[in-house]
Structures are given as C-alpha cells and as structure tokens.
Amino acid sequence: MAKFTNCLVLSLLLAAFVGAFGAEFSEADKATLVNDIAENIQKEILGEVKTSETVLTMFLKEMQLKGLPVCGETCFGGTCNTPGCSCTWPICTRDSLPMRAGGKTSETTLHMFLKEMQLKGLPVCGETCFGGTCNTPGCSCTWPICTRDSLPMSAGGKTSETTLHMFLKEMQLKGLPVCGETCFGGTCNTPGCSCTWPICTRDSLPLVAA
C-alpha cells in the first residue's frame, strides 16, 4: 500500500507539474507525459486489486487535475460531442492521449469500469442524445446526455462523469457506501470508508479482477 501511495503522490505531483508548466512542453511531450502518469496510476490500481469505484475516482481525479477533457460517452453514430474527444468505437477517447502497444491509458480504465457495470446487468448511460433518443437499453434522454431510467434528475447540466457519479450515489442509497472524498486529515466522514491517503476507499467490496 505504501508503494501505491508513493506512486500516487508522485503521479499527482507530475500531473500538477504538467498543468503548471505545460506551455513549455510540445504537444507530443505533454501527451507522452500524461500517458505515463495515467499508465502508472492504472498499474498501481490494478496491481493492488482496487475496487471499481476507486478506479473511477482516480480516473476522474487525475483527469480533472490536468483540466483535460473526460471522454467516455458511446459513439454509435461515429461522432463524439465532447470537445477534444474522438470516436474509438464503442466509446469516445481523448484525442491527445494515444494508445500504446501493451499499455493501457486512462480511457481503458474507464472502459473497464463501464464494462464491469454492464456485466452486472446495470445499464451504463452517458452517450449524448442530441437526436432525442438513446441506444442503450434502460436509458432515457435527459438532454444533452442519456441517463438511466431509474436515476433521479440532478440540478444543472450533466456530464458523463456526473452520470457515473450518480450511479455510485444510487449504490449508496442501496446500502453500499460510496467513498472517494479526500482524507488529508486522516479520517473519512462517510460510514464504511477508510482513509487510503489521499482519498477514502470502501472498507470491504467485491474486488475487480486484475
């Protein structure tokens, strides 16, 4: 766990460095560095057999720190409505983060999360629905994106990551704690969660196969 924490801290520092001094890098250099950060985080997450919620939390946190577009909507029509994302069927992936042979990117991590949720029989929504319809069974159009029929509406606009966060919140309502808040003080306010610095993780949850 110490190894994971050290790698995480280093990765987050690198992410902040890219954000602060990105202007001094070429686009190719920035893409390579970001890819390395994402790949290192994924290796540590899967190496420690983390939960799907933790994978999702780390994906979103790492992407948000850099201010890069978070893709993930389906692209059955062949296009992506999120700026900076391109269609790599069946989901959208970020333009600036190329895939490496033998290596996984953050998009792959998110795709694994979506696939795992689908294998559990719960529809994963998030594709855009500018045409007014959703291709995923069990999802309805809440413009501009699809949301699961059984999920409550949220105030304001929705993004793909907001939809997935609502899914986690729905799980919490069913008695499963949703962790992910920061715990710089060493404690977690959510019952059933423990501090795995710098974020809270669930005390016990079926594990994702590495």
From Swiss-Prot:
What Pfam families does the record tag this protein with? Cyclotide
Question: In this UniProt entry, which cysteines form S-S bonds?
Answer: C71-C85, C75-C87, C80-C92, C125-C139, C129-C141, C134-C146, C179-C193, C183-C195, C188-C200
Propeptide intervals in chain numbering: 23-66, 96-120, 150-174, 204-210
Q: Where is this cross-link: Cyclopeptide (Gly-Asp)?
A: G67-D95, G121-D149, G175-D203
Establish whether keyword Repeat is in the entry.
Answer: yes
Matching entries from InterPro entries are given as: Cyclotide (IPR005535), Cyclotide_moebius_CS (IPR012324), Cyclotide_sf (IPR036146)
Q: Hey, what's the signal peptide range on this chain?
A: 1-22
Picking any one GO biological process from the record gives: defense response
State the similarity comment.
Answer: Belongs to the cyclotide family. Moebius subfamily.
What's noted about domains in the record? The presence of a 'disulfide through disulfide knot' structurally defines this protein as a knottin.
Question: Which named protein is this?
Answer: Kalata-B2
